[in-house]
Amino acid sequence: MTSYESQGQSPTRCGPQFLSLGQEPPELSLYSDSYYPPPSLPSPQRTNPSSYELGDYAASSPNPYLWFNSPGMNSAPYLGGTPGPAGPSFVPQHYGMQRPYLGPGPPGGPGGELSWFSMPSQEDLMKLVRPPYSYSALIAMAIHGAPERRLTLSQIYQYVADNFPFYNKSKAGWQNSIRHNLSLNDCFKKVPRDEDDPGKGNYWTLDPNCEKMFDNGNFRRKRKRKSDSLPEKSSSGGNESGDSNGRGSPKSQSIDISTSPEKGPSPASTGPSPCLSNFLTEMSGVAAGSLDMEADPLSRPFTLSLPVDGAQRASQTTGFSTFTPSTTVSDWASPLPPPPPMSSSPSHSTLAYSGPVLSQFNGHFFPGLSSTGILYPREGTEV
């Protein structure tokens, strides 16, 4: 019986017992009964209580740093005694765990490097991603890059396959599309071979009138406007119309000359568009108003709409000064004008019922609104 009681009181000597196991770190010897009182042992044969194994608690913990065994982990905060130096994690089963997908973390902190995930190279991306060009644009690129500005059908195929690896997967589909675009698009002209030029097949070249449709790798289906292609003609026509309409007025002639593109670009063309300018102006005004409101919200006038009649209508625009918690209401409330002389007419009897109107306002936010301020009740009237 004596041996059973000594074993029942064994939790007070739990430190030396756990140190003898050789599995847990020495921080477990600081485990105190005041935080987690151990249960009584059911039988004398049970020598190692499982309630002190922190592996059961840490196994279900969602803390991801237990998987990295980072040097930045300190001892648990609920362990008694002075905090020791930074050491390894107190989870025994995680010491020798194999981590095939996690590489060594950086020296600055925890975190594993996913060595199995590799970013594709530029060549792989070009094979996977379809080029953002139409078949007409591809043909125009090939012909425009040739020294003599003409290519055969096989040379166009070769150019597309060499510069865009995406089309190497299935050649039948895109080659058929290129043949259709060559035959159906009027911008591509067939040129016969010379007699002294050996080979098979005709050359394909670009129509000189369609070369302006090729802009920055994008081949337009529609031609440019005459105003875009011939800016000088449009400007000269504008000057002639200005002279005919404003004949005899030097002011209109000076305006036409100053705005003509031949004399040089106007300042408005280099600046933002009118829509953008209006938008920026409006936004700057809104921003300035919001800054004023944030700086002193109580100093702005507050308008209160109340059912007050004619001559007895008080000033509805009241200015408030800034509020500080250390001052009282009488110190920071702004002075109000004296009440005007009251009339005994029954039309002003509504001014006497100022209590329900003022009850909906909080005195902390609107301290200047009182029965002696904006609303002037009749003398001798019971509220």
Curated annotation (Swiss-Prot):
The gene is foxi3b. InterPro entries: Fork_head_dom (IPR001766), FOX_domain-containing (IPR050211), TF_fork_head_CS_1 (IPR018122), TF_fork_head_CS_2 (IPR030456), WH-like_DNA-bd_sf (IPR036388), WH_DNA-bd_sf (IPR036390). Residues 1-55, 215-277, 317-348 are annotated as: Disordered. GO terms for cellular component: nucleus. It comes from Danio rerio. Transcription factor required for epithelial cell differentiation. Involved in specification of skin ionocytes from epidermal precursors. CDD domains: FH_FOXI1. Keywords: Developmental protein, DNA-binding, Nucleus, Transcription, Transcription regulation. SMART domains: FH. This is Forkhead box protein I3-B. Expressed in ionocyte precursors. Signal peptide: none annotated. GO terms for molecular function: DNA-binding transcription factor activity, RNA polymerase II-specific; RNA polymerase II cis-regulatory region sequence-specific DNA binding. It is found in: Nucleus. A motif (Nuclear localization signal) lies at residues 220-226. Its main location: nucleus. Residues 1-12, 250-277 have a biased composition (Polar residues). Residues 130-224 bind DNA.
